[in-house]
Amino acid sequence: MKPLIIIVGPTAVGKTALGVALAQALQGEIISGDSVQVYRKLDIGSAKPTLAEQGNIPHYLLDALEPAEPFTVAQFQTLANQAIQDIQSRGKVPIVVGGTGLYIRSLIDPFQFAEHGSESIRSFWTAFLSEQGKEALHQELAKRDPLSAQRLHPNDTVRIIRALEMCQLTGKPFSETRGNQDLNYPPLPPSTLYVGLTAPREIIYERINRRCEQMVAAGLIEETHNLIKEGYSPKLKPLQSIGYRHALLYLYGKVTLPEMMRIFQRDTRHFAKRQLTWFRRDPRVVWYDTYSGNLTNILESLIGTCSGMESRVE
């Protein structure tokens, strides 16, 4: 069986380029592990690889959904596993590329999700928020999970609803479940290579600042405006992701363009820091520095590792 390769790391570190180069070298196909790139019409703000950047490599879970369609970790787990099996059945190498931490954990660890009930629970708490307000929602979490309530600000309603949902699905406080998932890292199968890309923080931040400027220059604000003109609600989850929510602030006159750029860059840097914290917690990740080691050297190292893995598995 062909190995499974997973490439993770913070935004702007070079995951896409390495994934495509590796796929070209190993006869691989790519599965996106990104929670926003899965949506059609959200291209610039999600840093979705263009057709040219995809390098004639088949990509899965890009442009799979309309912006108004919900997409859960459980759905990702199912669809990504189906893609992995399909790719391996044809003698190709599946390569998962992405920075959404829980998506990646759902593939390599035995996370089990309730097949029914999650959407109805979320709908209940969303309606509760509309009727009772965010303070009341936060109080409900405090009753069930004081630690999570302490950690989450009342304004962070998306995460509060997620915590309440997990409390009901698991029967345990989300803080307890979260802690167990963070600390429990079972050994990877011998056919799985878990690669992390990093760089010095100042280099990552410099790349992020430049990328944010490039996104705005490429039409991020216009892309967001077109989605609103097409009738999509600004409250949709993908439109509340980094980049799109900042463009909305500008479009609705809440901030000037320079202020939008400043907070867009700041929030993206904070997001990258959280991504690094998440992935560095996992001792199974094999790290490569994209600043001190160029792409060719990293690529050669990974090709050698994969060849050795394939020999052992066979």
From Swiss-Prot:
Q: What is its EC number?
A: 2.5.1.75
**SUPFAM superfamilies according to UniProt:** P-loop containing nucleoside triphosphate hydrolases (SSF52540)
The segments labelled Interaction with substrate tRNA in the record are 34-37
Q: Which InterPro entries match?
A: Dimethylallyltransferase (IPR039657), IPT (IPR018022), P-loop_NTPase (IPR027417)
| Gene Ontology terms, MF aspect | ATP binding; tRNA dimethylallyltransferase activity
Cofactor(s) the record lists: Mg(2+)
Keyword check for Transferase? yes
Top enzyme class of this protein? transferase
Please list the residues that bind ATP: 9-16
- Swiss-Prot/TrEMBL site (Interaction with substrate tRNA) positions: 100, 122
Task: Provide the catalytic activity annotation.
Answer: adenosine(37) in tRNA + dimethylallyl diphosphate = N(6)-dimethylallyladenosine(37) in tRNA + diphosphate
For binding substrate, which residues are annotated in this chain's numbering? 11-16
Keywords recorded for this protein, A-Z: ATP-binding, Magnesium, Nucleotide-binding, Transferase, tRNA processing
Record has Nucleotide-binding as a keyword: yes
Per the UniProt entry, what are the Gene Ontology biological process annotations, in alphabetical order? tRNA modification
Described function: Catalyzes the transfer of a dimethylallyl group onto the adenine at position 37 in tRNAs that read codons beginning with uridine, leading to the formation of N6-(dimethylallyl)adenosine (i(6)A).
* Record's subunit section: Monomer.
Q: Describe the family membership recorded for this protein in Swiss-Prot or TrEMBL.
A: Belongs to the IPP transferase family.
> What is the name of this protein?
tRNA dimethylallyltransferase
Q: Give me the gene this protein comes from.
A: miaA
